[in-house]
């Protein structure tokens, strides 16, 4: 079944450190945002290759369950002679339940912290320096029991895949803006630069797949419960190295706040 749960925390504050009359000379602020979500669900992507599409295109006469209350699988289809009409006939509900598309869970965690300082020595002239830090981590677990739907769609042993990823980046931004008027002419000028860094040594990915599990249920489907001496596949690598530097400027003008 599909499920989605989300939890977020957001905190913002701003403090005036130096004030002269109606002029806020030095201001400090921070933004903190944390989110955590968990999701599980069926395959929905790919217009012609997802569980909803397969159910819509399935033979409506094929039962979902057999007389014992179990899912209508290969032996039932073969006994009833369905393969005489189409060798690819299958039960789309059984296909969904007996695969990682219907047995999966993803967890995501995100933390963003921003601190900034604004200095306004004279009215309209504002310098703003900002530093931000962002961290993300996620995990995924998908389980497929042993099954046989058709002669070509089958899995001889159960299987579980787990992966985890983590990473972080930081960014520095500096801007200088000046807002002023000359009679009925209004100007707003801004220049700035930004630098963002993420990459090697700042994140990593790890994934492993194992089969022949001790238990044939979702709750205990973990790599460590495999009877095999080692995972069928395993890989891990760092995130790619990348950085972005930008310089920008902007001029806004209006006449008498009309044009």
Residue ranges and their predicted role:
Residues 2-14:
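Short secondary-structure subsegments characteristic of cysteine-rich extracellular domains
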Residues 7, 110-111:
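C-terminal, structured domain-capping segment
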Residues 14-110, 128-246:
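Surface-exposed loop/interface segments of Gram-negative outer-membrane beta-barrel transport/assembly proteins
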Residues 249, 254-259:
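Short, intrinsically disordered, charge-balanced linker/junction segments flanking boundaries
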Residues 120-122, 256:
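Residue-level recognition of beta-strand termini and adjacent short loop/turns
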Residues 125:
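An active-site-proximal structural segment forming one wall of the substrate-binding cleft
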